[in-house]
Amino acid sequence: MEPISYLQAIILGALQGLSEPFPISSLGHAVLLPKLLGWNIHQNADYFLSFLVATHCATALVLFIYFFEDWKRIWFGFLRSIKGRATPADTDSRLAWIIIIGTIPAGILGLALEHKLRTLFASPTAAAAFLTVNGFLLLAVERFRRRPPIPGDGEGDGDERIAKMGFRQALGIGAAQALALIPGISRSGVTMGGGLLAGLSNEDAARYGFLLATPVIGAAGVLKLPELLGSTGDGVRGQALVGAIAAAITTWAAVKFLLRYFETNRLSPFGIYCVCAGVFCLVVFSV
């Protein structure tokens, strides 16, 4: 019997693609859904983690392609900065360092804590509890966010506003991403919440979250890709490919929707959803 069926792979892949950009915890949903549907999938099993590697790589690739023109500008801005050609007004150069500073602590803490956190909190009950916590955090961020937002000079200057964040704020947001290793806590929710508290608008915070997530998710996926290609990936490579395709499609749709959604809307509905879904799962699992 296959450890993951192709139908399950499509559903889990599509769910990963949707829930990674949304501030609702992709890892939490990957733990909760199989339990709710009665699937015989062990979340701590090597084959399941290998499957998730494929879907995360697909998500990171789509994020890179979606923001490819932005990444080109950021890359050339970074090159100007190390060659000493960047000016204080060079938005792309400063944005590059904002992303680098936010990525480093996330990577270090992720490598140090990933196995321990996932082992401690990978149970469906723990994931439901932390999903509820995630919801309350989103609601609290909207309540206590900094107002007015960081000013800009007009339309289309979101990168300029993001680049005006302090390096200390970027470092703190990057370190806080380690919380997303706990199933139920959302990486995009943490980064967007940090951006809002730093004074960004919802739209700019979402954009910053997507840019910051790309190297973090991509690096984590590449580091674990040998597991999928090695013996631990035996029996799930076909399902992983199907799941990755599903994740790629839904990631693109989710990012496109959210960038438009956050032009005029807030995090609150996602906070309410997380609280309701988390409490519902806790009740179901306790019966």
Task: List each language-model region with its residue ranges.
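Multi-pass membrane proteins that catalyze or facilitate reactions on polyprenyl-/lipid-phosphate substrates
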Residues: 1-287
